[in-house]
Amino acid sequence: MDAPHSKAALDSINELPENILLELFTHVPARQLLLNCRLVCSLWRDLIDLMTLWKRKCLREGFITKDWDQPVADWKIFYFLRSLHRNLLRNPCAEEDMFAWQIDFNGGDRWKVESLPGAHGTDFPDPKVKKYFVTSYEMCLKSQLVDLVAEGYWEELLDTFRPDIVVKDWFAARADCGCTYQLKVQLASADYFVLASFEPPPVTIQQWNNATWTEVSYTFSDYPRGVRYILFQHGGRDTQYWAGWYGPRVTNSSIVVSPKMTRNQASSEAQPGQKHGQEEAAQSPYRAVVQIF
């Protein structure tokens, strides 16, 4: 004769405490949560819509640490942006010669790839970077056009949440030759109308400099709605008009789409046991999120 059970078996997984269900959901891939689990019942839908779940998933997948103290406007959007987080520029460190770059101007002896530190140069701050692009005695410019939708950033995300777009570039001169470096970054609409731009004045470095690598960084925030493309262009020329490759050296360029870190009214985190759904109904991103899968 079987021993009597001390507690009756659960008739349904929904009888589990909501905290336990939330913990289970942190182990489920986001694709299944949105396309399958969220459709099972209203309880699952409301739990999956909780900011608390997506914060836990961020912690579990290493997007944040336990001591994270920065405010986040929307943990769901934060999660998906971190999932997509990468450098949108291809071949930024010249490892594949000129692959992926559009040559806009190829003056003098043209663009060339060299290995660090190069003649009369210095080591790059990051030892993982091994090569750089170098310009000549007439203008050399190269560019890439990034298609944000093709890279997985859906239109509703770009227009409603407008995540930060962080642009970085590194440049240096040879110690024995002066040069001029320039950078232009433009945010453009679907029909290539420029909506925002960053184009600082050209930087001129004098001859007999210390050849130090310099980082340029700029963040596009609260830009106009409608951004679909990013144009990145950089280059320059030497100032001595010497044959060969004595112009500015560039490498380790990057464009990264990052979550905003400012809390707003959409950032409330309802806890298990509270009423769900109301705080997220106004701007639920799920209809558009599934497009990334």
From Swiss-Prot:
<dbReference type="Pfam" id="PF04300">
    <property type="entry name" value="FBA"/>
</dbReference>
<dbReference type="GO" id="GO:0030246">
    <property type="term" value="F:carbohydrate binding"/>
</dbReference>
<dbReference type="InterPro" id="IPR007397">
    <property type="entry name" value="F-box-assoc_dom"/>
</dbReference>
<dbReference type="GO" id="GO:0006986">
    <property type="term" value="P:response to unfolded protein"/>
</dbReference>
<dbReference type="GO" id="GO:0005829">
    <property type="term" value="C:cytosol"/>
</dbReference>
<keyword id="KW-0597">Phosphoprotein</keyword>
<dbReference type="GO" id="GO:0006281">
    <property type="term" value="P:DNA repair"/>
</dbReference>
<dbReference type="InterPro" id="IPR039752">
    <property type="entry name" value="F-box_only"/>
</dbReference>
<dbReference type="GO" id="GO:0019005">
    <property type="term" value="C:SCF ubiquitin ligase complex"/>
</dbReference>
<dbReference type="InterPro" id="IPR008979">
    <property type="entry name" value="Galactose-bd-like_sf"/>
</dbReference>
<keyword id="KW-0227">DNA damage</keyword>
<dbReference type="InterPro" id="IPR001810">
    <property type="entry name" value="F-box_dom"/>
</dbReference>
<keyword id="KW-0833">Ubl conjugation pathway</keyword>
<dbReference type="GO" id="GO:0031146">
    <property type="term" value="P:SCF-dependent proteasomal ubiquitin-dependent protein catabolic process"/>
</dbReference>
<keyword id="KW-0834">Unfolded protein response</keyword>
<dbReference type="InterPro" id="IPR036047">
    <property type="entry name" value="F-box-like_dom_sf"/>
</dbReference>
<feature type="domain" description="FBA">
    <location>
        <begin position="78"/>
        <end position="259"/>
    </location>
</feature>
<comment type="function">
    <text>Substrate-recognition component of some SCF (SKP1-CUL1-F-box protein)-type E3 ubiquitin ligase complexes. Involved in endoplasmic reticulum-associated degradation pathway (ERAD) for misfolded lumenal proteins by recognizing and binding sugar chains on unfolded glycoproteins that are retrotranslocated into the cytosol and promoting their ubiquitination and subsequent degradation. Able to recognize and bind denatured glycoproteins, which are modified with not only high-mannose but also complex-type oligosaccharides. Also recognizes sulfated glycans.</text>
</comment>
<dbReference type="GO" id="GO:0061630">
    <property type="term" value="F:ubiquitin protein ligase activity"/>
</dbReference>
<feature type="modified residue" description="Phosphoserine">
    <location>
        <position position="284"/>
    </location>
</feature>
<protein>
    <recommendedName>
        <fullName>F-box only protein 6</fullName>
    </recommendedName>
</protein>
<dbReference type="GO" id="GO:0006508">
    <property type="term" value="P:proteolysis"/>
</dbReference>
<feature type="domain" description="F-box">
    <location>
        <begin position="10"/>
        <end position="57"/>
    </location>
</feature>
<feature type="compositionally biased region" description="Polar residues">
    <location>
        <begin position="261"/>
        <end position="271"/>
    </location>
</feature>
<dbReference type="GO" id="GO:0006516">
    <property type="term" value="P:glycoprotein catabolic process"/>
</dbReference>
<feature type="modified residue" description="Phosphoserine">
    <location>
        <position position="258"/>
    </location>
</feature>
<dbReference type="GO" id="GO:0000077">
    <property type="term" value="P:DNA damage checkpoint signaling"/>
</dbReference>
<dbReference type="Pfam" id="PF12937">
    <property type="entry name" value="F-box-like"/>
</dbReference>
<comment type="subunit">
    <text>Interacts with VCP. Part of a SCF (SKP1-cullin-F-box) protein ligase complex. Interacts with CHEK1 and CUL1.</text>
</comment>
<dbReference type="GO" id="GO:0005737">
    <property type="term" value="C:cytoplasm"/>
</dbReference>
<keyword id="KW-0963">Cytoplasm</keyword>
<dbReference type="GO" id="GO:0016567">
    <property type="term" value="P:protein ubiquitination"/>
</dbReference>
<comment type="pathway">
    <text>Protein modification; protein ubiquitination.</text>
</comment>
<keyword id="KW-0234">DNA repair</keyword>
<dbReference type="GO" id="GO:0044322">
    <property type="term" value="C:endoplasmic reticulum quality control compartment"/>
</dbReference>
<dbReference type="GO" id="GO:0036503">
    <property type="term" value="P:ERAD pathway"/>
</dbReference>
<feature type="region of interest" description="Disordered">
    <location>
        <begin position="261"/>
        <end position="285"/>
    </location>
</feature>
